[in-house]
């Protein structure tokens, strides 16, 4: 829940705003303004990610004890928040690519992320499983590897293709950084607040359900196991038809 909260606070709303602004500037033929918006979004995202990651890394003990009621999650949380800046930059570039109509870069990046995640978890489970502080740390390591691989692929692709845009620049039309920043914030802040409210409700659900299961079973590990089965196997199977209809 804390990691997903970082998504909502740091870049989720601004990624959507970036896609919208980029599409507008592309339609107007102002390529430089779209690229400037991307740079502004990356800077803003990096600042928010570093602040959030620093806070969570330093106070991981208190966060896990007070909110998660599971001190064993401390190494998992600390590793997860260290990856957050990479995820933020990657998602900003994905938003820019979607804005210019290039959807295969985010799709390919997601495929590489999943392949890297599963492969790294498999290899770590063979060679380093006994050295893991907790079993869940293995999954977090796989998540971190997948996100970093996806980050490098996305950044390298953008650096190689940033000069080969299909959109021709407008005839001398420019937009000031101040107006772009205002447009980004005016769109991004409401979207961020909306995403934050949804994520907070989901986080409360993710925390309360295991707590209530613990009250019922009287065993912390059994309650977490049941919750993992419900959220990871039962609910995705029940909700699978909605992935087709949506």
PLM-predicted stretches and their roles:
Residues 51-71:
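Short membrane-interface helical motifs at transmembrane helix boundaries
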Residues 109-123, 131-161, 231:
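Hydrophobic alpha-helical transmembrane segments
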Residues 1-23, 85, 203, 231-246:
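Small-residue-rich midsections of specific transmembrane alpha-helices
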Residues 86-109:
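Membrane-interface junctions at transmembrane-helix termini in multi-pass inner-membrane proteins
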Residues 69-92, 230:
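Alpha-helical transmembrane segments of multi-pass membrane proteins
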Residues 30-47, 55, 181, 185, ...:
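Interfacial transmembrane-helix starts/ends
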Residues 9-43, 99-104, 245-246:
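Transmembrane-helix boundary and interhelical linker motifs in polytopic inner-membrane proteins
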Residues 146, 150, 154, 158, ...:
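Transmembrane helical elements of multi-pass membrane transporters/channels
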